[in-house]
Regions:
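A short, Lys/Arg-rich alpha-helix, primarily the initiator
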Residues: 1-17
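Helix-turn-helix DNA-binding elements, focusing on the entry/boundary residues of the two helices
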Residues: 11, 22, 33, 48-51
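Alpha-helical residues within the helix-turn-helix
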Residues: 16, 27, 56
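Short alpha-helical DNA-recognition segment
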Residues: 19-41
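Short, basic-rich loop-to-helix N-cap that marks the start of a DNA-contacting helix
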Residues: 43-55
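Short, charged recognition helix plus adjacent turn
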Residues: 56, 64-76
Length: 76
């Protein structure tokens, strides 16, 4: 099972590495900024649809984002 905090952290770190704001990503993903904020803080888990929208908004393949999440879950 995925840890919501780790999922959120990976999404946030990737977004920030691309120099994208929450406003820009949430706008492209067609979700509220507060929803994205809750995902990044681990308060909410993204649905599969939202995960794909966020991936597209950040210009990363969903499979690549998932690999990053899996690596973070395995990290000590």
């Amino acid at each position: 099972m995925l840890d919501a905090v780790i999922v959120g952290r990976v999404i946030q770190e990737y977004r920030e590495s691309k120099g994208l704001s929450q406003e820009v990503v949430s706008g492209f993903a067609d979700i509220g900024r507060t929803h994205l904020s809750a995902i990044e803080r681990g308060v909410r888990k993204p649905t599969l649809e939202t995960f794909f929208k966020l991936s597209e908004a950040m210009d990363i393949k969903p499979s690549e984002l998932m690999k990053r999440i899996e690596a973070a879950l395995k990290a000590p």
